[in-house]
């Protein structure tokens, strides 16, 4: 029996869905070849885990399509010594990729049950070095700030100011910004005395709920 039955599916995902569409960071590609996405989706969806589409993970949340995960990860420009903050743990898949690239990963999840499942998924996949915290992601996580990179996996009307404040000098932040339905993916780079904004294209993410995001439904 093959030790890793989904290895070929991951290879094909990387080559045909990701590299073929312009993602060229070899460290990102290697991480996506390694991390078993099928361990981060519900059991009944494992057979479609490597298709290029988002999948439901419960409580109205999703695991993003592989290509969008790759785009966001590449634009973070993560170095091996970086400290990274993720807002919206979800399934834990994005955090697992970040852990392959960075020295430290903190991930904040609003929903306790989703956070618990993410921890279980990460343990099952053998991924370590990630601190999963339950809280309001729009407030970031000040105890570990500043961060070299921040990725936000849910959309808000504008980028929460606490996240910009917790980004270190030269830091990169990637987030979807705009209405609840569909948004623009943007990259912020914190320069000396200013913040540069770079548009990355249209996306559709679940809403980021919290004090500095969409209001209401703060508790599940």
From Swiss-Prot:
Pfam families for this protein: PCMT
One GO BP: protein repair
CDD domains registered for this protein in UniProt: AdoMet_MTases
GO cellular component: cytoplasm
Active site location: 64
Matches recorded under Gene3D superfamilies: Vaccinia Virus protein VP39
Primary localisation category: cytoplasm
EC primary class: transferase
GO molecular function: protein-L-isoaspartate (D-aspartate) O-methyltransferase activity
Subcellular location: Cytoplasm
Function in brief: Catalyzes the methyl esterification of L-isoaspartyl residues in peptides and proteins that result from spontaneous decomposition of normal L-aspartyl and L-asparaginyl residues. It plays a role in the repair and/or degradation of damaged proteins.
Similarity field: Belongs to the methyltransferase superfamily. L-isoaspartyl/D-aspartyl protein methyltransferase family.
Name by which UniProt lists this protein: Protein-L-isoaspartate O-methyltransferase
Organism from which the protein derives: Methanoculleus marisnigri (strain ATCC 35101 / DSM 1498 / JR1)
């Amino acid at each position: 029996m093959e030790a890793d039955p989904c290895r070929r599916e991951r290879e094909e995902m990387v080559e045909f869905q990701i590299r073929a569409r312009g993602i060229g960071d070899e460290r990102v590609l290697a991480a996506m070849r390694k991390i078993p996405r099928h361990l981060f989706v519900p059991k009944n969806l494992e057979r479609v885990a490597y298709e290029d589409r988002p999948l439901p993970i419960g409580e109205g949340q999703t695991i993003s399509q592989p290509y969008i995960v790759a785009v966001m990860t590449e634009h973070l420009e993560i170095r091996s010594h970086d400290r990274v903050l993720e807002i919206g743990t979800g399934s834990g898949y994005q955090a697992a990729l970040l852990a392959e690239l960075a020295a430290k990963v903190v991930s904040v999840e609003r929903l306790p049950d989703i956070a618990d499942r993410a921890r279980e998924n990460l343990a099952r996949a053998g991924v370590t070095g990630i601190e999963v915290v339950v809280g309001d992601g729009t407030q970031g996580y000040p105890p570990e700030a500043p961060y070299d990179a921040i990725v936000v996996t849910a959309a808000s009307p504008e980028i929460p100011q606490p996240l910009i404040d917790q980004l270190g000098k030269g830091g990169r932040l990637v987030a979807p910004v705009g209405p609840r339905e569909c948004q623009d993916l943007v990259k912020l780079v914190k320069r000396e005395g200013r913040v540069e904004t770079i548009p990355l294209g249209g996306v559709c993410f679940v809403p980021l709920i919290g004090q500095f995001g969409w209001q209401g439904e703060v508790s599940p």
